[in-house]
A protein has these predicted regions:
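ABC transporter nucleotide-binding domains
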Residues: 1-126
């Protein structure tokens, strides 16, 4: 039986506010962030970020909001470029389609794009 971790959650964070989300293991913190960053669909209810609906406006939210998980989900045997292309495909897009959004970062990884992800340092993986 699935548990509803985020039941009856109501949260509003104002512009410029500093906010921290804390709680015990399994409380739903990661699930909440994945929903708010459009990486996971909620089973029910609604969520918005910057006044944008996380389902209807997911492309605009992804343009504005970044999410860096504590663990990295790179495929160690693929190159940096292969990983980027794979994850772009997962999100039904391409690097070329979003190049204006990733140009600065992409130029920084250019020297490493043919390196296997397993050979990157932790900082480079981020």
């Amino acid at each position: 039986m699935a548990m509803s971790r985020l039941r009856d959650l109501s949260l509003e964070i104002g512009s410029g506010e500093l906010f921290g989300l804390i709680g015990p293991d399994g409380a739903g913190k990661t699930t909440l962030f994945r929903i708010l960053t459009t990486l996971l669909l909620a089973d029910s209810g609604t969520a918005s970020v910057c006044g944008l609906d996380v389902v209807k406006d997911l492309k605009e939210i992804r343009r504005r909001v970044g999410y860096m998980p504590g663990r990295f989900s790179l495929y160690q045997d693929l190159t940096v470029e292969e990983n980027l292309n794979f994850f772009a495909t997962v999100f039904n897009t391409t690097i070329e389609e979003n190049y204006d959004l990733v140009r600065d970062i992409y130029s920084q990884i250019e020297p490493f794009k043919h390196r296997r992800a397993g050979k990157l340092s932790g900082g480079m993986k981020q």
